[in-house]
From Swiss-Prot:
Component of an interferon-dependent multiprotein complex, at least composed of IFIT1, IFIT2 and IFIT3. Interacts with IFIT1 and IFIT2. Interacts (via N-terminus) with MAVS, TBK1, TRAF6 and RIGI. Interacts with COPS5. Pfam families: TPR_12, TPR_7, TPR_8. TPR repeats lie at residues 51-84, 94-127, 136-169, 172-206, 207-240, 241-274, 415-448, 450-481. It is found in: Cytoplasm; Mitochondrion. Residues 467-490 are annotated as: Disordered. It comes from Homo sapiens (Human). GO terms for molecular function: identical protein binding. The keyword Mitochondrion applies. Expression significantly higher in peripheral blood mononuclear cells (PBMCs) and monocytes from systemic lupus erythematosus (SLE) patients than in those from healthy individuals (at protein level). Spleen, lung, leukocytes, lymph nodes, placenta, bone marrow and fetal liver. GO terms for cellular component: cytoplasm; cytosol; mitochondrion. This is Interferon-induced protein with tetratricopeptide repeats 3. Induction: By type I interferons, dsRNAs and viruses. The gene is IFIT3.
Length: 490
């Protein structure tokens, strides 16, 4: 094939609607457990949805450098489309054909790539468009793919677009409900339960949406009503991993930690390489320690050994999470709700000394900025912390965070010292040592929590040694800023 033809392919391929043009992953970086989760869904999903997952799996295989395996996944997708959507096979195959063209292009098999480009062109010509068409099922295909890759805002747009053409389509409605649920953590995007209820009405067998409705009702202080939906979903889909995982989250929030651990462990049986699940189980064990401390059980005879055992379980699962590839920054993010509950309510207590309030305002500010939950809330707490300290130097630090971090010149009482050390160990490949540093950083943040939860992460001597540091009122950088700074060292 001539160079001219190769150049023409390079102009055409970006016009194809498929995984290679949807910008699914930042810098083509895929989380280690995504392939496991996609394979799990292929095993448990209804046949009509499997083609979507095979297409995504093909793209993941390509990113891993395994293009032959990618082609096999595309063959599976093509066969399933022919079986399940024979009357719409050509249109439903457009995404698969686009993926074929891209994979063959990367393999250097340009004539094969051209064959699939021509297939797309022949189908799209019927709709007066050379290489792409507007079609609700294609929007839905992209929506499910974006959703699986964590791009919830884009998924929402895709499902909304599909519903404009077919407003009562059960699949489109379920997709929109799931996308909106995942966006619900952002205050400006909160929604009513009507979207989830409509999805259940149109798809009464979709047990995952029922669990999401249960979680939403729990947030609205209607836990008993929500639990009915969760129990029904577990009864009807006892092996569906997304149902089990979300139900575990419900029971963790409820405080039924043993039930949550049981459900998370059942999910691990199907996806044993999912570091996030190990992390969640570790958090449950930490919460069990907190429960015992809050009720005074930790002082009872024989319970000290149990406390130590629970702490060890928590540490073991946290370390296992890192061994399985969980990014420590993600673990830090997942603890946001836990951290806020434990020690970020300090600024609202009028009896707390001003110095302590100022520290807490700043930590709350950093946490909000990192999670992206609310810039307004972050700014508010940052300014309130400043007004308490009345120090111009602190104002400058919040207004303009430092852009460089000195290598290994920081004293141990410097802000976020252990967090930076953890990043360094992680970059050097020493995940276990990184985990220990992150635990100490969490302990530093939680040291003055009323429940004493900081003792999970720090020894008694470290708790005492750090008291002076906590009283200095130093302004800490947020995790995102620290990551940016650490990358500048390399």
């Amino acid at each position: 094939m001539s160079e001219v033809t190769k150049n023409s392919l390079e102009k055409i391929l970006p016009q194809l609607k498929c995984h290679f043009t949807w910008n699914l992953f930042k810098e083509d970086s895929v989380s280690r457990d995504l392939e496991d989760r996609v394979c799990n869904q292929i095993e448990f999903l209804n046949t009509e949805f499997k083609a979507t997952m095979y297409n995504l799996l093909a793209y993941i295989k390509h990113l891993d450098g395994n293009n032959e395996a990618a082609l096999e996944c595309l063959r599976q997708a093509e066969e399933l489309i022919q079986q399940e959507h024979a009357d719409q096979a050509e249109i439903r195959s457009l995404v698969t054909w686009g993926n074929y063209a891209w994979v063959y292009y990367h393999l250097g098999r340009l004539s094969d790539a051209q064959i699939y480009v021509d297939k797309v062109k022949q189908t799209c010509k019927k709709f007066s468009n050379p290489y792409s068409i507007e079609y609700s099922e294609l929007d839905c295909e992209e929506g499910w793919t974006q959703l699986k890759c964590g791009r919830n805002e884009r998924a929402k747009v895709c499902f909304e677009k599909a519903l404009e053409e077919k407003p009562n389509n059960p699949e489109f409605s379920s997709g929109l409900a799931i996308a909106m649920y995942h966006l619900d953590n952002h205050p400006e995007k909160q929604f009513s339960t009507d979207v989830l209820k409509q999805a259940i009405e149109l798809s009464p067998d979709n047990q995952y949406v029922k669990v999401l409705l249960g979680l939403k009702l729990q947030k609205m202080n209607k836990e008993a009503e929500g639990e009915q939906f969760v129990e029904e979903a577990l009864e009807k889909s006892p092996c569906q991993t997304d149902v089990l995982r979300s139900a575990a989250k419900f029971y963790r929030r409820k405080g039924d930690l043993d039930k949550a651990i049981e459900l998370f462990q059942r999910v691990l049986e199907s996806t044993p390489n999912n570091g996030y699940l190990y992390h969640q189980i570790g958090c449950c064990y930490k919460a069990k320690v907190r429960q015992m401390q809050n009720t005074g059980e930790s002082e009872a005879s024989g319970n000290k050994e149990m406390i130590e055992a629970l702490k060890q379980y928590a540490m073991d699962y946290s370390n296992k999470a890192l061994e399985k590839g969980l990014n420590p920054l993600n673990a830090y993010s997942d603890l946001a709700e836990f951290l806020e509950t434990e020690c970020y309510q300090t600024p609202f207590n009028k009896e707390v000394p001003d110095a302590e309030k100022q520290q807490s305002h700043q930590r709350y500010c950093n946490l909000q900025k990192y999670n992206g939950k609310s810039e307004d809330t972050a700014v508010q707490h940052g300014l309130e912390g400043l007004s308490i300290s009345k120090k111009s130097t602190d104002k400058e630090e919040i207004k303009d965070q430092p852009q460089n971090v000195s290598e290994n010149l920081l004293p141990q009482n410097a802000p976020n010292y252990w967090y930076l050390q953890g990043l360094i160990h992680k970059q050097n490949g020493d995940l276990l040592q990184a985990a220990k540093c992150y635990e100490k950083e969490l302990g530093r943040l939680l040291r003055d929590a009323p429940s004493g939860i900081g003792s999970i992460f720090l020894s008694a001597s470290e708790l005492e040694d750090g008291s002076e540091e906590m009283g200095q009122g130093a302004v800490s950088s947020s995790p995102r800023e620290l990551l940016s700074n650490s990358e500048q060292l390399n």
